[in-house]
Amino acid sequence: MAQLYYKYGTMNSGKTIEILKVAHNYEEQGKPVVIMTSALDTRDGFGIVSSRIGMRREAIPISNDMDIFTFIAQLEEKPYCVLIDESQFLSKQNVYDLARVVDELNVPVMAFGLKNDFQNNLFEGSKHLLLLADKIDEIKTICQYCSKKATMVLRTENGKPVYEGDQIQIGGNETYIPVCRKHYFNPEI
């Protein structure tokens, strides 16, 4: 029986590497997968999943109004798994479409993304994945300032912490830092 998996972690926790690893393992066995990512994430190009260590692959970009269920249902070859990067940027309807892929097409879906934003609010996609996922796993990494587990994301601009502003601002290591709770409120900048 297929399931909807939600695997979340802070920045630099290896979410995209995990997607690429899972895809490789399926494909090594001759089992096709579909890799998708939010159309909002254009850091490394449109429709690209890219890890910070340099591994990258093309992916199907997901817009907020895309009918993911119909897209997967109409593929000529049924995938063995659907892998989603940057799932925090998905709309509520996108997440419900993923649940339908699992329930009606019997295709496992693994969604990877951030849980909370730099203000410690849930992203729309994260909120609905937490509600609908059959299995929820945390991908762990450590705080940039100490050896505790990072549970939050600190946004910085010009070396200063930022706690207000737009929820979505696509960035990389230079803008967002994985931190523990202590260093979120008292960063060593």
Curated annotation (Swiss-Prot):
InterPro entries: P-loop_NTPase (IPR027417), Thymidine_kinase (IPR001267), Thymidine_kinase_CS (IPR020633)
GO BP terms, alphabetized: DNA biosynthetic process; thymidine metabolic process
PROSITE patterns per record: TK_CELLULAR_TYPE
Intracellular or extracellular location(s): Cytoplasm
Pfam families listed in its UniProt record: TK
Keywords: ATP-binding, Cytoplasm, DNA synthesis, Kinase, Metal-binding, Nucleotide-binding, Transferase, Zinc
Swiss-Prot/TrEMBL catalytic activity: thymidine + ATP = dTMP + ADP + H(+)
GO cellular component term of the entry, any: cytosol
Protein EC: 2.7.1.21
Active site (UniProt): 86 (proton acceptor)
GO molecular function: ATP binding; thymidine kinase activity; zinc ion binding
Domain of life assignment: Bacteria
Entries under NCBIfam families matching the protein: PRK04296.1-4, PRK04296.1-5
PANTHER family hit by this protein: THYMIDINE KINASE, THYMIDINE KINASE, CYTOSOLIC
Subunit structure: Homotetramer.
HAMAP family associated with the record: Thymidine_kinase
Similarity comment: family membership: Belongs to the thymidine kinase family.
Name of the molecule in the record: Thymidine kinase
Organism for this UniProt entry: Streptococcus pyogenes serotype M28 (strain MGAS6180)
GN (gene name): tdk
